[in-house]
Amino acid sequence: LTPETASFPR
């Protein structure tokens, strides 16, 4: 899990 996907857990 990268910080980007953590902001967009879609």
Curated annotation (Swiss-Prot):
Superkingdom, taxonomy of origin: Eukaryota
Extra remark beyond the main annotation: Has been extracted from the spider web. Is not a smooth muscle agonist.
Annotated organism of origin: Trichonephila clavipes (Golden silk orbweaver)
Purpose of the protein: Is not toxic to insects.
Record's keyword annotation contains Secreted: yes
Residues where Arginine amide is found: 10
Keyword presence, Ribonucleoprotein: no
One cellular component (GO) term of this entry: extracellular region
Subcellular localization, as worded in the UniProt entry: Secreted
Organism placement in taxonomy: Eukaryota, Metazoa, Ecdysozoa, Arthropoda, Chelicerata
Protein name as it appears in the record: Fr.III-4
Alphabetical UniProt keywords: Amidation, Secreted
